[in-house]
Amino acid sequence: MIQPQTHLNVADNSGARELMCIRIIGASNRRYAHIGDVIVAVIKEAVPNMPLERSEVIRAVIVRTCKELKRDNGMIIRYDDNAAVVIDQEGNPKGTRVFGAIARELRKLNFTKIVSLAPEVL
């Protein structure tokens, strides 16, 4: 579960290393975001000499959470970290690579470009 002020790792090579969630896109008073939700975040740590800089406000989609994800077949998936992929306004990733495993639920939510870049889909 991701809420405002939560720090997340970045799972792509867009230039950001760490994000802080400042808003959850969707209903006006959503408290938590889960895998596949789009958030507004600020970059807290960035790689030098890259297009994205520190304190820049961006959009990102959540690809991993520490909170368990329960599927319809009874399977429970839990990751070791909270991670997101930086996206543009159309929902396309800004980076060209995605690191780490991501959940299969992103394919149902039309983030197929992110799924195709991922090395492992659980």
UniProtKB/Swiss-Prot annotation:
One of its GO terms (cellular component) is chloroplast. Coiled coil: none annotated. Transmembrane segments: none annotated. Pfam families: Ribosomal_L14. Keywords: Chloroplast, Plastid, Ribonucleoprotein, Ribosomal protein, RNA-binding, rRNA-binding. Binds to 23S rRNA. This is Large ribosomal subunit protein uL14c. It comes from Calycanthus floridus var. glaucus. The lineage of its organism: Eukaryota, Viridiplantae, Streptophyta, Embryophyta, Tracheophyta. The gene is rpl14.
